[in-house]
């Protein structure tokens, strides 16, 4: 998911540099959402992994 966030951020930066303000804003919004969604999923999986690892061992 972080990979897609970086791709959308690059698209947003290029679109902004070329003057496509609306498209740049939308791409950056998608990039921001994907970045935070990826971080939240990673944290949840880390916590679940730590709690399950304690129960298994």
UniProtKB/Swiss-Prot annotation:
It is found in: Cell membrane. Pfam families: DUF1328. It is a multi-pass membrane protein. InterPro entries: DUF1328 (IPR009760). Its main location: membrane. The keyword Cell membrane applies. Keywords: Cell membrane, Membrane, Transmembrane, Transmembrane helix. GO terms for cellular component: plasma membrane. The chain crosses the membrane at residues 4-24, 33-53. The keyword RNA-binding does not apply. It comes from the Bacteria. HAMAP family: UPF0391. This is UPF0391 membrane protein XCC1302. It comes from Xanthomonas campestris pv. campestris (strain ATCC 33913 / DSM 3586 / NCPPB 528 / LMG 568 / P 25).
């Amino acid at each position: 998911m972080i990979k897609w966030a970086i791709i959308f951020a690059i698209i947003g930066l290029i679109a902004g540099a070329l003057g496509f303000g609306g498209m740049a804003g939308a791409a950056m919004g998608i990039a921001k959402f994907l970045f935070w969604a990826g971080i939240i999923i990673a944290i949840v999986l880390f916590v679940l992994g730590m709690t399950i690892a304690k129960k298994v061992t």
